[in-house]
């Protein structure tokens, strides 16, 4: 009985993993850190709070103008 429960739990976790992968989600205990330089083009996209538009690279960068 105990072995059946353990195997059942393992199979459920395995199915959930494949479901997440099929949905395009990564399974990782580590969170991704936002890059210091955002790839948003400044002319067509407003920079988030705490970022400014770098005129040279046309990208949002962390800091103040």
UniProtKB/Swiss-Prot annotation:
Listed name of the protein: Kappa-scoloptoxin(04)-Ssd1a
Keyword Secreted listed: yes
GO cellular component, one term: extracellular region
UniProt source species: Scolopendra dehaani (Thai centipede)
Primary role: Voltage-gated potassium channel inhibitor.
Main location: secreted
GO molecular function, one term: toxin activity
Family: Belongs to the scoloptoxin-04 family.
Upper taxonomic lineage: Eukaryota, Metazoa, Ecdysozoa, Arthropoda, Myriapoda
Tissues and organs where the protein is expressed, per its UniProt entry: Expressed by the venom gland.
Keywords from the named record: Disulfide bond, Ion channel impairing toxin, Potassium channel impairing toxin, Secreted, Signal, Toxin, Voltage-gated potassium channel impairing toxin
Signal peptide: 1-24
Proregion positions: 25-36
Localisation: Secreted
Intrachain disulfide bonds: 42-53, 47-60
């Amino acid at each position: 009985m105990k072995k059946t429960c353990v195997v059942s739990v393992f199979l459920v976790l395995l199915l959930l993993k494949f479901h997440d992968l099929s949905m395009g989600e990564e399974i990782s205990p580590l969170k991704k850190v936002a890059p210091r330089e955002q790839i948003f083009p400044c002319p067509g996209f407003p920079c988030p709070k705490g970022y400014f538009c770098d005129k040279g690279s046309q990208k949002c960068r962390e800091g103040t103008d």
